[in-house]
Each structure stands twice: as structure tokens, then as C-alpha cells.
Amino acid sequence: MVAKNVDNPWLIGYFVGNEPAWINDEVRLCQIILDGPDRPIKAALKKYLESNADTDENRVAFIYDAFDKFLETVDKVYKKYDPHHLNLGMRFANPDTITETLLSICGKHFDVFSFNAYMLAPDKDMLDRAYACTGKPMIVGEYHFGTVDRGLAQALWQTDSEKDRADCYRYYTENAYAHPAFIGSGYFQWSDQDITGRFDGENYNCGLVDVTDRPYKAMVDAMIATAECLYDVHC
């Protein structure tokens, strides 16, 4: 995958994962490893705990060490086979839930710190903390707004109308780019989801177009207006 894109001028970089489920559940993750089939990581964990005592703190430390090594390995592969593109991080959920130690590990290996943030707008204190710990520029990988007036579920952040949805898009995006370390955002998603739902039943009104490819004019106009002012908004 990496090698075939090495000279692609339209590619910014690669994400190395998405919303890892083990964040703040490292102790339980260790138990799952110990209860599971024999694997190299199980042997390494048992050896680590035997040498350092089986405590919650040591279990967390082991997972952090393993994660550090994983990120180091992945980044070396990226840099070896495609030095022209960025390591865009792991698209964590709310970075406020991530410890400063873990954020610092991310800062060692990512070119960009990425996270998904379904909220009215990214909190400045949250962005300040993430940047202070990682030292990396930041992008939001996912955010959106929806309504219930289209016969679909309202999405992860509900508004009352299509106009409100467009206003919320502008408020979120322009507030995010007002932070000097914020460099990109990805709206989720291009089209509404089918009323019958995707693989997990999710059927949100969150698109820029509906399921018959008809644009939501308010959203399109809002995106144009925001795009035209972003360089003025960005510090």
C-alpha cells in the first residue's frame, strides 16, 4: 500500500489506526492477553509481570511500552518505503481522555496528532493540552452535524434544521482553525447513510448530499464561506 503511493502528489499521508478501544482499559487488556492463546506478546507480558510484580501500574506500563514499540516500528516502515508522505497518527477519540504519558509517546512517532471529536467545537484547553504533550500539529479526522427532519437518525451531534446544521459546521470549523497548531479537518461524511443502515445499523443524516446525490445547499454554502475565510481565521 505504501510503496504504490510514494509519488502520489494528492496524498497527504497515512493514518495508523482509528479510535483504539483499549485506551484507559489497559489493565483489562492485559488480562485478555493473559487469558488468550499463546502469542509472543503473552510471553513478553508474563515475563514482564514476573520481573516487576503484577500490579495495575505495571500492566499499564507494559501496554504503553508495547504501544511505543508498535508506533516506532510502523513509522520506520513508513519512512523507509514512503518518505514523501506524513504519518497522520491514530485518530483517537476525545484527547482529553488520553494520559499525558500516552500523548508524549504519540509525539515521538507521529508527524501529526489526529483525533475524532464529535462536539459543538473543539475546546481550546483540549487543543492546548494535546499540543503541549505531543508537540505536533493537529487534525480532526471526523466530526459532523445532523437533523431529524430528513427521516434519518440525527447523527452524533443533533441540530434543529439544515440551516442550523450549516451554522454549526461553520462554528466548529472556524473555531478549530483559530488554534495556531490546528492544520486540518475531515467532515464525516460525503453522503447521508441509507435509511436501512450500514453494517452496524447506523443511518445518520450527516451528509453533504442525500442518498440520491442531491446537495444540501445550506451545507455547501457554509463550506464555501468557511473555506474563503480560513486563512484569515487561522492564527
Q: Model regions: which residues?
A:
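Polysaccharide-binding and catalytic clefts of secreted carbohydrate-active enzymes
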Residues: 10-101
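Glycoside hydrolase catalytic-domain groove-lining segments
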Residues: 61, 65-76, 80-155, 170, ...
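Surface-exposed, flexible loop/turn segments at secondary-structure boundaries
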Residues: 22, 95, 121, 146, ...
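Phosphate/diphosphate-binding loops
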Residues: 1
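Substrate-binding cleft of secreted/luminal carbohydrate-active enzymes
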Residues: 11-13, 18, 143, 157-209, ...
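Short, solvent-exposed loop/turn and secondary-structure capping segments
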Residues: 24-29, 125, 150-151, 197-198
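Aromatic-rich peripheral "rim/lid" segments of glycoside hydrolase catalytic domains that contact
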Residues: 31-46, 188-235
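Alpha-helix termination/capping residues and helix-transition junctions
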Residues: 5-8, 107, 179
